[in-house]
């Protein structure tokens, strides 16, 4: 199984659009980090709790969008390459070829999501925290931007920020499952990239203009946003502003895990049927 995952990784590295995405994503991350540091002027204006409050907002500022961009560009061809390179018939020649290939692609997707979130999170915490010497990093968190700190066990500012990236990882898997399903259905990289990237942009736009919409539109769209991958990526599915939805943080986590498992199951069903066609 390990060598199959390594083979998927080699395929991934061979895709030209992936390296373009890495370059653009790296520039976007550097821009986001530079903007955060230059605008906040951590060392001069704010106390330690306020500085960590700003660090908490980095996911909203650039983390979620950068994660979605790297997933939307990096994953579709991984599913479509056998069809586009006309090697799909070879997968079915082995007794368990389809099943093993699906497992390898799913496992690589999980590892890819983990790597993307870890790099973004580590860079954000190291650069932003280092800008003020990690002052108050181990002090108890005083408040949360996205979800109520009272719903969580006592933790430090640094642990709270790290936990946010754990929730971002959950949102990344949620979005990745959607990408796998779309790519398996369309079997075309460009179309999948357009549909998946466009879906995230619609969710992102709703997060900005949603409250201004008429109620008959806002209610169903808000439910779709909050229970979909958009709300999970942008952390609003955990928001303390909506206690009537989530009185405890385990509820959105449990829903997210359930949706991810459902997506991976649907991906297997669609993948198997398409490979037989």
Enumerate the language-model features and the residues they cover:
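Alpha-helical transmembrane segments
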Residues: 19-28, 115, 259, 263
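Secretory targeting signals
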Residues: 26-82, 103-185, 205-207, 225-253
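Hydrophobic transmembrane alpha-helix segments characteristic of membrane transport
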Residues: 85-89
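Residues that define the loop-to-transmembrane-helix transition and helix capping
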Residues: 99, 189-190
